[in-house]
């Protein structure tokens, strides 16, 4: 048997982190088993669906690198198939027409609540029977699935273990509305059957749907897939993760400067573990992932942990991979990196200091763009009269360098210190402010090596002019 999983979001909003984790688990299980992963868009809610949401889901999946083997399939393109299966159940007396209006059902529900009874649909209720008997052909009706009344539905959840629900606790589910459109729970079953889905990985909010769907599978004569229901993701305050906790859309994390590898690594650990290991390459995730190792308990989303992971991936990933995802942020900040050092070299030097790609894009501007002003605080502290001579000596030595390397620049700084008998800080910090415009950067010799000789000379001269003007105005 070829394992086949699916991710089946409804296009009523963005791809949120809970859905992304479900998609990741489903994708990993398929890859771990040498199987296939299907993407299906469950767009039967015609009032709430939008093409914008479909596009956002596809963009999020592509950004995370969760490539699908089949699809995307759209339920709205399969209504004829669903209605064919509804008619099959009607013909076999496994479904029936119900003419009870919404108003009548609301009235019955209110009576049940007043009598402290559990509100539920009962086909044998006198008022419902009367409505069905009084109906004429052509009157609006829904089609209900005739749920078994005896016995129980038992299934072995791959995460939660054995689950059993008595059939007498379940209503006769509506499977076709009065407007002729099929309902979610029915479409899902027909889709999973037609698409050969063997394993359904989804959120725990679907557990109540599962026994109802299992009865429909069996009524259709379809094989019942294996189910695995993931626990929810909580905010750091213990409440269900929502917009008030900050970003919940996958693409918001892109916008905030997270790498997809970091977000995938973080999401896989929200409920799954392999010993004490924290960092997983995609290959390791695929090889090690198991549904049996997924926790039944809810996991709390921790942004600090995600930032730590993101910093790890910025520091340790192939710089070309980081550059690929950095480009979006460079475009947002209107920073052209074609006029300057290779972006991969800059990433190697600056990346280890950054927790997000937004920070990285902000911190590399001085490699590619000249500036006309120094950061006020850094200039006030380091571009003073005492820095004039060290910078003048450094400028002369910089102009004399013929082989522009980090090693030669390091030696230049050491030579300035030796010649003037000063400590490293007396030249290092003024030089850093001069060539970067601010007081924070990696090692100044390495920074200068990438900025290039021409720019460094011009910036040191600008710093000396700043000091002269400052002294003149003192």
UniProtKB/Swiss-Prot annotation:
InterPro entries: aa-tRNA-synth_I_cd-bd, aa-tRNA-synth_I_codon-bd_sub2, aa-tRNA-synth_I_CS, aa_tRNA-synth_I_cd-bd_sf, Glu-tRNA-ligase_bac/mito, Glu/Gln-tRNA-synth, Glu/Gln-tRNA-synth_Ib_cat-dom, GluQ/Sye. Coiled coil: none annotated. It is found in: Cytoplasm. One of its GO terms (cellular component) is cytosol. ATP binds at residue 243. The keyword Aminoacyl-tRNA synthetase applies. A motif ('KMSKS' region) lies at residues 240-244. Its main location: cytoplasm. It catalyses: tRNA(Glu) + L-glutamate + ATP = L-glutamyl-tRNA(Glu) + AMP + diphosphate. A motif ('HIGH' region) lies at residues 9-19. Monomer. Belongs to the class-I aminoacyl-tRNA synthetase family. Glutamate--tRNA ligase type 1 subfamily. Catalyzes the attachment of glutamate to tRNA(Glu) in a two-step reaction: glutamate is first activated by ATP to form Glu-AMP and then transferred to the acceptor end of tRNA(Glu). This is Glutamate--tRNA ligase.
